[in-house]
């Protein structure tokens, strides 16, 4: 009789502990989801602002007399339009939700990879800009020379700015994922008729 009562108490205790762990996990997921959403929003606001500045600077191409500057500002304006197309949908899209920390951690890892790939492309853009400016030196035609210099400068400026942006977003997403992963180490309880067993989940 006493053993049965003890077993019942174990089951009740186990149920209460599991419920408490699930409640804590739900609260953590909500908090970290909000943090991820705010991080993404800040990033896209920055990208939208940078895009708007570059589009606005395109007007300088209409008033400058330097063909090199015309090419530089025109290319910047083109970059701005592309960045705007990327940033605006992300700002207005419905935020993602997650049912548990594992889903959130997986999505953060995927986001890290995207920013890491983008950072690699940024380095390529910078290299292309340097290459264009070097190529300009071999051109005899003045306008052609100025065109390559203008486009090259734009690629270097845009590539550098985006490299800092992507590197920052990569690092912030990684930092959040590490924090989420650390919390995934939970203590669960397994109840048998005679014993409690502790299981550490990583």
Task: Walk through the language-model features, giving the residues of each.
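Juxtamembrane "helix-exit" motif on the non-cytosolic side of transmembrane helices
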Residues: 59-65, 138
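Alpha-helical transmembrane segments of polytopic membrane proteins
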Residues: 46-50, 75-80, 119, 155
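Membrane-interface helix-boundary motifs at transmembrane edges
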Residues: 64-71, 142-144
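Loop-to-helix transition at the N-terminal end of transmembrane alpha-helices
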Residues: 67-83
